[in-house]
């Protein structure tokens, strides 16, 4: 089990991947490793998992992530930091001088990229729509079958269930539905 997790503090500290193994029904002998690579931690964990299988080192590897970069430090005693005068992450004098008036988050970064490359809301909706279409077509054509290990468990209602597909793909995505989604910030893309 390889999980990405930026700034491991609070509930996600102490090697979250190992804790996930110990919290599961896996044998204690299953290793768990956490990767901290800032915004790319979860993606890196998945790459490491793929490489382990491709190299023949491992037969089955679970790769994933638990980070929410915009909320770092998750679980930290933020109030204590405020009381000590530390403020928010990225709240240094150098950052304030370099980027006056900007509050950093993933959403701010996305808006800056969209602005730099003149991407409109419509451009991004079209990209998202096509991405879901491609993923849905690949799923229906069974392209992902060799990459997904079916996992059994209980769903939210407590009924036994088998997860055999990526649940993030929206098979019913449409441009109208995407256009109806609110932006994270007023006037954003």
Segments (PLM) and residue ranges:
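Flexible glycine/proline-enriched surface loops and loop-helix/loop-strand junctions
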Residues: 93-94, 115, 186-189
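Membrane-embedded alpha-helical segments and adjacent helix-loop junctions characteristic
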Residues: 1-3
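Conserved catalytic cysteine-centered active-site region
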Residues: 5-59, 100-108, 172-189
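Flexible glycine-/small-residue-enriched beta->alpha junction loops
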Residues: 60-113
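N-terminal extracellular/periplasmic Venus flytrap/periplasmic-binding protein-like
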Residues: 123-189
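Active-site-proximal alpha-helical scaffold in enzymes
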Residues: 37-67, 114-143
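Short glycine-/acidic-enriched loop or helix-start segments at secondary-structure transitions
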Residues: 12-13, 71-74, 155
């Amino acid at each position: 089990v390889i999980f990405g997790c930026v700034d491991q503090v609070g509930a996600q500290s102490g090697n979250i991947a190992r804790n996930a193994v110990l919290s599961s029904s896996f044998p204690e002998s299953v290793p768990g490793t956490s990767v901290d690579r800032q915004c790319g931690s979860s993606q890196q964990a998945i790459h490491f998992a793929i490489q382990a299988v491709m190299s023949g080192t491992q037969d089955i590897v679970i790769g994933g992530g638990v980070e929410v970069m915009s909320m770092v430090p998750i679980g930290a005693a933020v109030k204590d930091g405020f009381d000590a005068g530390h403020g928010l992450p990225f709240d240094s004098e150098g950052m304030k001088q370099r980027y006056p008036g900007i509050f950093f988050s993933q959403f701010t970064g996305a808006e800056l990229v969209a602005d730099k490359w003149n991407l409109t809301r419509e451009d991004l909706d079209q990209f998202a729509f096509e991405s879901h279409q491609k993923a849905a077509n690949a799923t229906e054509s069974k392209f992902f079958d060799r990459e997904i290990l079916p996992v059994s468990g209980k769903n939210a209602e407590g009924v036994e269930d088998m997860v055999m597909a990526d649940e993030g793909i929206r098979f019913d995505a449409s441009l109208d539905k995407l256009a109806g989604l609110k932006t994270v910030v007023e006037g954003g893309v």
